[in-house]
Amino acid sequence: MDVRQMKIKAAELALSYVENGMRLGIGTGSTAEEFVRLLAEKVADGFKVQGVPTSERTARLCLELGVPLMSLDELPELDLTVDGADELDRHLTLIKGGGGALLREKIVAAASSRVIVIADETKLVETLGAYPLPIEINGFGGIATRISIEKAAAKLGLSGTIGLRMSGDDLFMTDGGHYILDASFGRIPDAVALSQALHAIPGVVEHGLFIGMASLAVVAGSDGARVIEPVA
């Protein structure tokens, strides 16, 4: 079973948690897109959902496939969000934002009664940090913000390269008009401390650490998909 097949298996199991008539947050990224395709097949057969996308990219795919959408202002309280992750640990602390939608993903997740994370087994790790941590920043004073992040990380014993994300020859820009710094710390032993330190920096809009937000994870491997609940 290749990685895409694993993603499909995870999406299939996650879809079983979606009930007819739900207000559904819909995530961003390659695994979330497999979920959208499967959801669209059910919608075509008469299944009812009201979807809230976490990015313009997800919105375009949903509209293309016929998944009905509303804005979060129209549906400010959601029953469930299904989204992917770039990394997750056994506590279901996540690194997200590889697709550049971390701010909207976090807002939608916070508005949801439950959050299900879908991933292939390569994303499940003992300690977060091998995947670079996305940090969304304001365009004003970006260098000063990066220096502040480096200093805050150093106080926590973290070091590594922190660089602006590019899109071809241009700086990558989020749907909200911000930039992203990708921080390659290698290992993040205390996600809570890092989260607090980053939130204290004025130029940081949001970061890709999702702590205590996931209700469960559906992780697929070569032997199929399984449900993982957070370890206290």
From Swiss-Prot:
Gene3D superfamilies, A to Z: 3.30.70.260, 3.40.50.1360
Enzyme class, spelled out: isomerase
Residues at which substrate binds: T28, G29, S30, T31, D83, G84, A85, D86, K96, G97, G98, G99, K123
Superkingdom in the source lineage: Bacteria
Catalytic activity: aldehydo-D-ribose 5-phosphate = D-ribulose 5-phosphate
Keywords carried by this UniProt record: Isomerase
Gene transcribed to yield this protein: rpiA
Active site residues per record: E105 (proton acceptor)
EC number: 5.3.1.6
InterPro entries hit by this protein: NagB/RpiA_transferase-like, Ribose-5P_isomerase, Ribose5P_isomerase_typA_subgr, Ribose5P_isomerase_type_A
GO terms (BP aspect): pentose-phosphate shunt, non-oxidative branch
Protein name: Ribose-5-phosphate isomerase A
